[in-house]
Amino acid sequence: MHEYYRKNAPKFKKSMINLLKPVAPEVELHTGRDFAAVSEEIWRHYEKNMLAYFPYIGGDTVSGTKNLTGAYCFVSMGEVLKRYGVGMEEIGRLMTLAYERKMGKMPGFIGALLRKACKTPGLLDRIFVKKDAKNAANAAKNPGSFETKTVIPPEKGYAFSYHNLVCPLSEFAKAHRYGAYMPYLCNLDYVMFGVFGVPLFREHTCFEDGDYCDFKIRLGAKPLDAWPPVFAQGKGYK
């Protein structure tokens, strides 16, 4: 285990419980146990199988660390729920539900600001080009961390287009056989954008296609529902 994860384990445990607590009633129903007891079981799995093997990708200095550590809380929840006979689709539903309930508590002004920014694609381009440079500098120091590219001009039919070229979540899933979770983890992006009222569309993922994961915004479109999962809706999006 990298020293960063060892030192911050109490913080990660607190974050994990806060992330999963919104589906405490469903977890208790499936397991027949109190959420406090199940969350301890999930934490033990997470500490042993996730924290012990996570790559160091920049720690608190980069947002990607929170993406990696947060996403795999859901995977540990799923691995524990499997012990109680819960299937992958229901696990995916609980992942989506937990994130929806958590994101639903975000202040409304954040979504308003994001929607306003999306109506000014040039502003988004400038913001994300700076993020590309920051990610590239971090990746030079910490190989395997997120690498991104803002597509200018954006892909045809979209106001904004952004690619993840390297995704630590995908690489960790491949290395540790958590691939069944990746479509559901990617689907959580639709939860976040949907809560903010931003119409996200994706046709590529690093895990499935091996090239990049795209984030595309089409102004004036209706955000896709996050459940049933977008990849199962038959619209060609992932």
Mark where each language-model region is:
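Amphipathic interaction/junction segments at domain boundaries or subunit interfaces
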Residues: 69-175
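Short, cationic low-complexity segments
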Residues: 230-238
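N-terminal, charged low-complexity regulatory/assembly segments
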Residues: 1-84
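Short, charged/polar, Gly/Pro-enriched secondary-structure boundary elements
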Residues: 169-171, 221-226
